[in-house]
From Swiss-Prot:
GO terms for biological process: thiamine biosynthetic process; thiamine diphosphate biosynthetic process. This is Thiamine-phosphate synthase. Binds 1 Mg(2+) ion per subunit. Belongs to the thiamine-phosphate synthase family. 4-amino-2-methyl-5-(diphosphooxymethyl)pyrimidine binds at residues 40-44, 75, 113, 142. One of its GO terms (molecular function) is thiamine-phosphate diphosphorylase activity. It catalyses: 2-[(2R,5Z)-2-carboxy-4-methylthiazol-5(2H)-ylidene]ethyl phosphate + 4-amino-2-methyl-5-(diphosphooxymethyl)pyrimidine + 2 H(+) = thiamine phosphate + CO2 + diphosphate; 2-(2-carboxy-4-methylthiazol-5-yl)ethyl phosphate + 4-amino-2-methyl-5-(diphosphooxymethyl)pyrimidine + 2 H(+) = thiamine phosphate + CO2 + diphosphate; 4-methyl-5-(2-phosphooxyethyl)-thiazole + 4-amino-2-methyl-5-(diphosphooxymethyl)pyrimidine + H(+) = thiamine phosphate + diphosphate. Gene3D superfamilies: Aldolase class I. Keywords: Magnesium, Metal-binding, Thiamine biosynthesis, Transferase.
Length: 212
């Protein structure tokens, strides 16, 4: 069962985000031990794992997440999410229509990216558990990231969807999280703030203070 508190500190990463001196398992384990509330496996880019290698890694990471009682979401790959029985799926505006697969994800978490009011108005949220809003700030983690919308987009969306779970994403770090909290987000999604942190435990606990 989805709870908006699971969005508090939502960690996203794939092998492409991990520093060369670490493994994805090591980084995720540190983040889980520190208290992340949700994990999304997002394997993208020219050197991304594919096929069986991607599936085996996803299974390993799901098992790791479950050992800490944290759900694991798969980004964009509906087939993989089904094959590994992931806890949910997150899709973007240009990905598969949610109505096409929602029936296969009953009792699972479904997330949708929403970048602005126009995208919100074009989106059917009837099968969606939460929306990821952003990018908040300039980000280097996504090559195809659009122009930042800023934290104010959260409060603009709140005028239409008062209690709907919203997680902020894009360029978020320890120095700029406060405005996102002030605007009413239920949590933050981060990639590099954790993968590039010199002290993952300290970073995650810092973020958690804002949402607990």
């Amino acid at each position: 069962m989805f709870d908006s508190k699971q969005l508090s500190v939502y960690f996203i990463c794939g092998t492409q985000d991990i520093p060369k001196n670490k493994s994805i398992e090591q980084v995720l384990k540190e983040a889980l031990e520190a208290g992340i509330t949700l994990y999304q496996f997002r394997e993208k880019g020219p050197n991304a794992l594919k096929g069986e290698k991607k599936k085996q890694l996803a299974l390993k990471l799901k098992q790791l997440c479950h050992s800490y009682h944290v759900p694991m979401i798969v980004n964009d790959d509906v087939q993989l999410a089904q094959e590994i029985n992931a806890d949910g799926i997150h899709v973007g505006q240009d990905d598969m229509e949610i109505q096409q697969f929602a029936s296969q994800f009953k009792n699972k978490i479904i997330g949708l990216s929403v970048g602005n009011l126009k995208e919100y108005q074009q989106s059917d949220l009837s099968k969606v558990d939460y929306i990821g809003v952003g990018p908040m700030y300039t980000t280097s983690s996504k090559d195809d990231a659009s122009k930042p919308v800023g934290p104010s987009m959260i409060s603009q969306l709140r005028l239409y969807i008062h209690d709907f779970p919203i997680v902020a994403i894009g360029g978020i770090n320890e120095t700029n999280v406060q405005p996102i909290v002030d605007e009413g987000a239920d949590g933050i999604s981060v990639i590099s703030a954790i993968t590039r942190s010199t002290n993952i435990d300290k970073t995650v606990k810092y973020f958690l203070r804002y949402f607990t």
